[in-house]
């Protein structure tokens, strides 16, 4: 992955002492963004994105524009169809609907002892751990990324990456060195369940409202009738999460949705317009399964009513 234009990081630095590659698996905006930031930090990055996307990434590349910078940075990706050599890090950044297909590129014997960061919004990742090994870490991206063809946009403030410590967490933490000079704010969490729901609750509510009304979340917050639904839906989601013994603080989750950047669109909104249903299935399955475990009648919830309307839109 070689930048064709000036990158966002100008500080002079030595290349990483560990020259093993970082593999980033996926074909979405998060894949491109993480690959670009890790390249800016001097790492050898290889993207696994499937036949068509591999060709596009390696020949046409992508451009990255961040609200926090006036620069437009261009990148071409080194690509592969599978993990060929022992990496120092593997990142699974694929959308929920593409995770299973992307796992065909990984194998325990190739990954070795390298940590695997899994950014998927899927709640249950046990089957992924069985495929990649016990050094799997849940990770969550708190930022607003959008992709339009070969253009990737980061809206709003500098994003944050939350990495959840796994049961094999060792005192020697490899991530500070890997993410140094990327410009990302990296935090480490011990409560994976809480971290998941603090990510998923605003993601689900923002996705459902914007998709149903075919409006960006920013526009929804300017409409009082629609805006007033946000606290109620967050509260419903928090009640479902309580089935796992978790008490979510709803106020910061509501504020997060109120502060969405003007141009940001949740993936579900675009997917419905294209006739897809992967995101709807993801959100529905997480909420329904968690509600069942919490012994909550999900069928009577406002969340379920919105989901039904969204499926009707998809089927039209």
Locations of regions flagged by a protein language model:
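NAD(P)-dependent Rossmann-like dehydrogenase/reductase catalytic/cofactor-binding core
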Residues: 3-6, 45, 231-316
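Rossmann-fold dinucleotide-binding core
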Residues: 122-199
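NAD(P)+-binding Rossmann beta1-loop-alpha1 motif at the extreme N-terminus of oxidoreductases
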Residues: 6-72
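Rossmann-like NAD(P)(H) cofactor-binding subdomain of soluble oxidoreductases
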Residues: 69-152
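A structural signal for isolated positions on well-ordered beta-strands in alpha/beta enzyme cores
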Residues: 23, 46-47, 117, 137, ...
